[in-house]
Design a protein with these regions (language model features):
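Short, hydrophobic/aromatic-rich segments at coil-to-beta transitions
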Residues: 1-4
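Active-site- and interface-proximal helix/loop "cap" or "latch" segments in soluble metabolic
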Residues: 6-19, 23-83
Length: 83
């Protein structure tokens, strides 16, 4: 199932998620640091939602209180609630 999340406090403008049965199939960040977001997206493909959240939640970007990785964790929590 496809999901869209609007991140807050980061450079990315949107996170597009394809997840089913508790597994991340695909993630795409719109905007943000291209290399970092592509790397995150590639690494989380095929992983359980809860494992991704556990690994990425709380990561900060510089002096910001959040990061694209942390925002992905927040998005995946919402996805898990809807599944």
């Amino acid at each position: 199932m496809q999901y869209s999340y609007t991140p807050h406090g980061v450079c990315s403008r949107a996170i597009l998620i394809d997840a089913e049965d508790g597994i991340v199939n695909k993630v795409q960040f719109i905007g943000g640091c291209s290399g970092n977001t592509q790397g995150i997206a590639a690494l989380v493909e095929g992983m359980p939602l809860d494992e991704v959240v556990k690994r990425l939640e709380g990561i900060k970007c510089g002096s910001r209180p959040t990061s694209c990785a942390d925002q992905l964790a927040k998005a995946l929590k919402k996805v898990a609630e809807e599944q």
